[in-house]
């Protein structure tokens, strides 16, 4: 699949309509810091959050909620007519959606899949909302501490992998 690279000045239809379309049928991987952020917002322990709302020992958010019109399961944190029940504690993947972030040569790059902006298919109403620069979007999503946590976690995982060989 084609990947479109972006820069912080890229202007995109990033104002969220809060329709919840992105909360269905996804795979959201979590790092330990995100698991902790979720549990704090839910006011339960990390272990309780992991056991109730995650799969594979806490590394993947469970999508076992009510299905949408396409038959895709809702995120375990999604509430009809409200949205994310733990919005302030949401992980980096949700903060960046529909964008992705990849690290190459120790530099972060923001991307989206395909040559057409992903939200336009299921959330065409975003075209009627104000467009934002990628930099403005990231600031509004408060992504920075989550990016730092993700970067540090990736270093730890790489070090573990290096030790194995």
Which sequence ranges carry the predicted segments?
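Short loop/turn segments that flank or connect secondary-structure elements
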Residues: 1-165
């Amino acid at each position: 699949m084609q990947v479109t690279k972006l820069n912080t000045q890229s202007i995109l239809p990033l104002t969220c309509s809060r329709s919840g379309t992105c909360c269905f049928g996804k795979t959201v991987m979590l790092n330990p810091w995100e698991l902790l952020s979720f549990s704090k917002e839910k006011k339960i322990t990390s272990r309780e959050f992991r056991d109730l709302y995650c799969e594979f020992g806490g590394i993947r958010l469970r999508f076992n909620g009510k299905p949408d019109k396409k038959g895709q399961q809702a995120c375990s944190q999604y509430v009809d007519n409200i949205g994310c029940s733990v919005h302030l504690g949401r992980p980096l993947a949700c903060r960046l959606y529909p964008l992705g972030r990849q690290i190459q040569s120790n530099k972060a790059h923001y991307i989206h899949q395909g040559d057409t902006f992903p939200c336009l298919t299921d959330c065409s109403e975003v075209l009627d909302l104000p467009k934002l620069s990628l930099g403005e979007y990231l600031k509004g999503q408060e992504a920075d501490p989550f990016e730092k946590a993700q970067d540090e976690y990736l270093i730890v995982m790489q070090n573990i992998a290096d030790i194995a060989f």
